[in-house]
């Protein structure tokens, strides 16, 4: 089912959670992000971000936190592999995904 058709129908929580993971993985693959920058960029609550990132493995995406400094939380997330997911497909549909999950995709750069 195309994303446009899915967006017009009622979408399950699971489907939105799946799309949220794809969107976050896209952001992490494009730039270096930590929880704070993802929170500012997406407006998603910190706990939602943590839960989504922790569940990446459920859909085959492997992510790691790269320590960048002395503090434990100083660093960024890096996508190790997209697994069975086509990152090119996500890149092509990122605006649609963002609209469905309620995020403004045009604000993908931090000021």
Task: Please place each PLM-identified region on the residue numbering.
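Pre-recognition alpha-helix immediately N-terminal to the DNA-recognition helix
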Residues: 19-26
